[in-house]
Amino acid sequence: MKRLLPFLLIAPLLAEPGDKVYQKGFLSKEDSHKSIELQDDYSFELVLSDPHIHEPVAMAWDGNGALYVVEMRTYMQDADANGEQEATSRISRHEDTTGDGVYDKHTVFIDNLLLPRMVLPLDDRIMVGITNTLDLWTYRDSDGDGVADEKVKVYEGGNRGGNMEHQPSGLVWNLDNSINITYENKAYRFTDEKLEVQKLPRGGGQWGIGMDDAGRNYYSAAGGERPAFYFQQPIKYGALDLRGQEADGFRVVFPIADVPDVQGGPRRVNARGGLNNFTGCAGQGIYRGDRLPADLKGNLIIPEPVGRLIRRAKVTRENGKTVLSNVYPGTEFIRTRDINFRPLWATTSPDGAMMVIDMHRGIIQQGNWTRPKSYLRGVIDKWDIDKNIQKGRIYRLTHPTFKADKQPRMLDESTAELVAHLAHPNGWWRDTAQKLIILRKDRDTVVPALEKLARSHSSELGRLHALWTLEGMSKLTPGLVSFALADQSSLVRTNAVRLSEPFLADGNQDVIETLGSTPALVEDIEMVIQTINSIGASGSDDPKLIAVIDALLERHGENETVGAIKNLQGSVVASRAEARVQKRLGAAFGKAMEHGKV
């Protein structure tokens, strides 16, 4: 069922002879809300808006459910981007004190920032990244007034040049305890209170990073018109895309806002005057909650701010390959005719729902592309949208069956109490508990409880997070990894292979022999793919592991993903036999040198 109030009854209009009817200025909050069309009895609830937030672009919750909103208050305040580089933006903090789901207590947590772009709540600190620098800072409110009063630089990355739309975003604490960002070929990791850098084979993405329950990330690129990519495997093993990973026609969009303000110009405008292809895709997120209809779980939600729409993509994983398809062929999950609806962030919330940021403004393209005489400048001037600024909305996606979960109080709980949340059906709770345990000073006290959970809990996701929590604490044992390699769950087994990498690198024979003799490795294609990746990543040339690789390639070499990984990691996998020959030749050459024969 669609829900739409006839737009022409509510919009401020200006008729132009011989031309279409244009919306001018802003709709009221009520009318803008009513104009949003949603599928399948879903609806939006407005939980936070201006005047409490202005120009919101990202958000995240701390362990007690306080919401931190990143506000780029100087972004495109006119068509020439005047004043954009002034340090007057902020990160605000919001609480729901009544339990009704609406945020009613508001403070400015950090003020006078230069276009903040990343926020990651840690324990009682939040980590922040801003524009034009790769430095990262943590902020803390030490006196409980909702305003940060302590600031510590945790990473010195130096200046970062380039257009503000093409600088890193993210700061996503991943399942594997890496903290991922876009663009840069690196990730971060907390080890004993120090933020360390991990090199990656490639960077990617633009605004936001999604993550599924298996720890695979979903990147997007507005400039590249790519709604999702690099989601076939963790990017540490290489940036892998497969042919056909998007269903036919997936990039075609179906807006009802017929506004041609697209940077790609007329080629990206349909016959009605609206967007015809993904272009502004940003802030995508996998729904990992437990309070909305079950068929939404695992779907990728992709905001498209240029099209004033949100795509719901079904994520299908078969034979080691992920494919995305539009759940609603020929239409969209969420869309509106309100020209100021600019969705650009979607994420699972602590209450089990999903929250969406609507930046709610006229211009959604940085000034480099809106210069005088440009195509976009002509559209901006004709529609008079440069004056539509300093608003912002956050919506909760809800459903008649929705019943909100309790508010979290994890920052107040003991480390022992946090362990149970690792098996929570909502991914936000699991991720947050894992992060908090790793950051706690008394984390070693819960090692026995984590090991028990990893071995015997009925929830495969609980076992999975217990294993990765131990890994983040440097308390994972080879015995537990060997045990997990035989888990009844393919998801747990596959991650156990990932977790085995340091033990493979160290030549731990118990783990090596267990991996090679695991019955599931014969037919579990997910485990096969991960084993090929992990042996390669370990750098081991143990003959037993080489035999495992050879056997897997012989048995599964025709699998599309296995073939792609073989090509991607040719120096590790496809050329392994040649490398062994070269190694033997090198050794022989060295001995010959010693004996004066060459």
What kind of region is each of these model predictions?
Residues 16-417, 428, 436-439:
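Beta-propeller domains with acidic blade repeats across secreted/periplasmic ectodomains
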Residues 425-426, 458-459, 488-489, 522-524, ...:
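Short inter-helical turns and helix N-cap capping residues of alpha-solenoid HEAT/ARM repeat scaffolds
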Residues 548-549, 580-586:
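Alpha-helical repeat scaffolds
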